[in-house]
Amino acid sequence: MSVYRIKYTPRARQDLRKLPRDVAQKAIRAIDEISDAPYLYIKKMKASNPKHPVYSFRVMRDVRALLSIHNDVLIIHVLEVEHRKHSYRDF
C-alpha cells in the first residue's frame, strides 16, 4: 500500500500519450513504486523554487519524470514525463 497518492497534471498525461506504450507503462509502474518512500529515488532540481521544489526521477535510462511533492497532504504531483533532453527546459 502506498503512502503518497499520485496525481498527474494534464501536461504529464499528454506526455505519457506521446511516449511509446511500453515506455509509458514502465513510467507509470516506476512512479507507482516510489510512492512509499519517494525521497529515496529522486533528486531536487537546483534551479527550483525553495518553497515549492521540483524533483527529477529517473524512470528509465533516457526518460525523466518531474515531480512536486506535497507532504502535508501526501500527494506526488507528476508534472512532466519526457525524454531527458526535453524534460529540463521549463524548470
Positions of PLM-derived features:
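Enriched for short, Lys/Arg-rich terminal
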Residues: S2-R5, P10, Q14, K18, ...
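Alpha-helix boundary/capping and short turn/kink residues
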Residues: R21-A24, Y39
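A short, surface-exposed loop/turn module that caps and links secondary-structure elements
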Residues: D32-F57
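Generic hydrophobic secondary-structure packing signal
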Residues: Y8, V23-K26
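Hydrophobic alpha-helical segments with strong N-terminal bias
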Residues: R5, D22, I31, M45-K46
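A general lysine-centric signal
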Residues: K26, K43-K44, K85
